UniProtKB/Swiss-Prot annotation:
<keyword id="KW-0472">Membrane</keyword>
<protein>
    <recommendedName>
        <fullName>Complex I assembly factor TIMMDC1, mitochondrial</fullName>
    </recommendedName>
</protein>
<comment type="subunit">
    <text>Associates with complex I assembly intermediates during its biogenesis in a NdufAF3 and NdufAF4 dependent manner.</text>
</comment>
<comment type="similarity">
    <text>Belongs to the Tim17/Tim22/Tim23 family.</text>
</comment>
<dbReference type="InterPro" id="IPR055299">
    <property type="entry name" value="TIMMDC1"/>
</dbReference>
<feature type="transmembrane region" description="Helical">
    <location>
        <begin position="183"/>
        <end position="203"/>
    </location>
</feature>
<keyword id="KW-1133">Transmembrane helix</keyword>
<dbReference type="GO" id="GO:0016020">
    <property type="term" value="C:membrane"/>
</dbReference>
<dbReference type="GO" id="GO:0005739">
    <property type="term" value="C:mitochondrion"/>
</dbReference>
<dbReference type="Pfam" id="PF02466">
    <property type="entry name" value="Tim17"/>
</dbReference>
<dbReference type="GO" id="GO:0032981">
    <property type="term" value="P:mitochondrial respiratory chain complex I assembly"/>
</dbReference>
<keyword id="KW-0812">Transmembrane</keyword>
<comment type="function">
    <text>Chaperone protein involved in the assembly of the mitochondrial NADH:ubiquinone oxidoreductase complex (complex I). Essential for viability.</text>
</comment>
<feature type="transmembrane region" description="Helical">
    <location>
        <begin position="131"/>
        <end position="151"/>
    </location>
</feature>
<feature type="transmembrane region" description="Helical">
    <location>
        <begin position="67"/>
        <end position="87"/>
    </location>
</feature>
Amino acid sequence: MNFLWKGRRFLIAGILPTFEGAADEIVDKENKTYKAFLASKPPEETGLERLKQMFTIDEFGSISSELNSVYQAGFLGFLIGAIYGGVTQSRVAYMNFMENNQATAFKSHFDAKKKLQDQFTVNFAKGGFKWGWRVGLFTTSYFGIITCMSVYRGKSSIYEYLAAGSITGSLYKVSLGLRGMAAGGIIGGFLGGVAGVTSLLLMKASGTSMEEVRYWQYKWRLDRDENIQQAFKKLTEDENPELFKAHDEKTSEHVSLDTIK
């Protein structure tokens, strides 16, 4: 048992990136970026202040790392839902087209393919939109509730996942009445609890915490902004073509028309 506890990092080596050093050395406390991250947080802030800070845009026009994670989860959910809905709906459209047009006389082979392609594309778009916004709204609500509760409490636990799963499941089945909402809440709470236990176990096994995850998000944002600034700087330096640069080097001496008579 002791061997498994000491080798807990190897249990998720294929899932999470590895770090050198002990678990408490993953984030260097003397790092300038970490100090700047701590300096941006008030020393004694309430839950409402943390929640307000989450929805505040900084001076550079960037959203908070917590809100950015909710946005990424919602977009990923929309993308997965759109792909799933598009594939399933287009497959149904293909089968219906083949069954309903077995005796149809088309002008040519290309005309049949064109109509099949049109119906395939339209149904793919319909299915993608139908499932995309639903899954996107579900994942955005789920991760949004988890993040808001975690930010308000200042820590992460299983309760956020249970509450988020129950609330989201109930709202998803609101069209079925109270019984549907109750069933959706129970199923959502169960699935949310499973997801919460899995996430917390992964963080514990890797020796990380939610604060460290937010720190790395903060650091990656700084690195991204710095790379963008360097790219713009290089772009402005390369605006002059090589021909103009060569001309400027050859005519670096001051040329005047005063000597011409």
